Amino acid sequence: MPDDAALMKVEVAGVCGTDVSQYRLPLRGGPLVMGHENVGYLSRVGATFAAHKGVKEGDLVFLEHYLPCGHCEWDHMGEYRHCAATEWFYDPKAIRYGYTSTDIAPGLWGGFSHYLYLPLNAVLHRVPKGLTAEEAGVATPMSNGIQWALIDGGVGYASTVLIQGPGQQGLCCLMASKHAGADRVIVTGTSKDARRLEVAKAFGADVVIDVETEDALARIMESTDGRGVDVVLDCTVGAGTAPTLLGIEATKRRGGTMVVQGEGNQEFPSFPIGRLTRKGMTLKSARGHSYRAVELALHQLASHRFPLELMMTHTFGLAGVDYAIKSVGGQGAPGAIHLSVLPWK
């Protein structure tokens, strides 16, 4: 192993909706090992790597899936998600944990395995004391929640927030919003999300709405005294255009921000731009997270303010990866929200 690299023993690899989408698509760029939400212990650390990163063997770390170039403008801002060197969506040769082919040496690029290779440009965070590896495995969706709700959406003290979709991303947006002092948080879902909506209540949601059995807009306006919401966080990938339209209508008369999760592929040929501009709304696309968001996420998780165990529903060994991915996609274990692969289980 090079002196400027390290080896990480994977303790936890989270499973998310992106894994479901990736699993269904044809391979790009050769065979690969999936798993991009990784926590583990540094089992071997080169001297140069240790000096540069300030870590040592035995440290428990959360590993971001980005492997940036280290010298572009985005990297200098801690916005590794925008670095071209790790932009797998447009360049199959870009290196990113969970997406890069095993054909690229040394091949240890996916967390659904026992070990990961960490070159000098790996981005890692020490896990705070008192936080278990499995709890730290929630850091990716929590980072997204903090990025989308607080940093991108501007949620803060006394905000009124609408979160559409009570999956792991939506629930983390909820926790981030409540932690930041939001006054009222409304969470919407469908009838199949009944258990997730109950978890949302336990996490502090002030109002939960089943959009299939209730008039969602009427409930939102009733619960906000007709004012509407300040921020809409749309976490409903694959739900079509209805959530976007609801978000526009539910936003207050003037101003307001709507953040739409950026993994959706649905077309919107008749987007009501006039309704958006007449309200002076800001529309943003949410995708990934910044370095700062991860640091804040680990700090929040370590506070143990929320009953995370309600969201951490299932764990599987490596033999159960197929079932775990299908479960996140709604075709496996019932009641699945956040699932983790424990490679040594």
Please provide the spans of the model-predicted regions.
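Cysteine-cluster motifs in flexible loop/terminal segments that predominantly coordinate metals
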Residues: 16, 64-124
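Residue-level marker of beta-strand positions
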Residues: 37, 59-60, 74, 115, ...
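Mid-domain Rossmann-like dinucleotide-binding core that forms the NAD(H)/NADP(H) cofactor-binding site
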Residues: 114-115, 122-214, 218
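Glycine- and charged-residue-rich phosphate/anionic-cofactor binding loop of Rossmann-like
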Residues: 284-287, 299-322
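Glycine-rich phosphate-binding loop and adjacent beta-alpha segment
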Residues: 182, 195-201, 206, 237-303, ...
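Glycine-rich beta-strand-centered segment in the early N-terminal region that forms part
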Residues: 1-13, 25-76, 80-81, 128-130
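C-terminal capping/lid region of NAD(P)-dependent oxidoreductase domains
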Residues: 210, 222, 226, 231, ...
